[in-house]
Amino acid sequence: MTPSPAADLLPYTLVSTSMAFFLFGFQTHEKSILLPLLPLTLIMTARGDRTGAGAVAADWEWAVLANNVGMFSMWPLLLRDGQGLAWWVLLLLWNGMLGYRPWEALRSTRATFVAWLSAAVHAGMLLLMLAQASVAVLPPHASGWLSALFQRYPDLFPVLNVLLCMPVFMLVWLWSLKKHVEITLASGVLVVTKSIK
């Protein structure tokens, strides 16, 4: 017995509904990003299947980007809880085991939108973390205007984290909706007919 064509929709349905809950839900916590990361990780298991003109490879890139950005969005929470070192080790092991290098795809002559987005977002994440680390090691008397800035805006780095992560989450949500439409129309689950009068 062959599986229903609608079974292909299940991971994308889970991504779109859980991402919508995270983005538009009332009083969601930073840890709520783990809910959409579960089906995104499920989508990553299809990396070896290169059918569909590279569509599955692009899905893998979107899922890895979302997982890395989801981990980065939890950085302020984990740093506050004293889990910064565990976060680094887990992130490096995760990307190393996957063989993911965000800037490698740019060497290709046909770099995709998600490859450029991933490279830019990963560069932004690194810059933000370097800025936060450099501010943490500066002595208080080193820069008067810098210490005044952080006294006035103590949550500057968590806000910058949100400003970097939220557009990526919105794009992942829109991508999952686009995949819904593509799979639905391609599998015949939804047939668009034109009535003839």
Could you say what each language-model-derived stretch is?
Residues P5-L9, R50, G54-A58:
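Juxtamembrane/transmembrane-helix boundary motifs in multi-pass membrane proteins
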Residues L40-D49, W94-L98:
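Transmembrane alpha-helical segments
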Residues L14, S18, G54-K197:
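Transmembrane helical bundles and short interhelical boundary loops of multi-pass, membrane-embedded
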Residues P5-F22:
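Transmembrane alpha-helix segments characteristic
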Residues M1-S4, D8, W175:
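Non-catalytic interaction/regulatory modules that flank or connect domains
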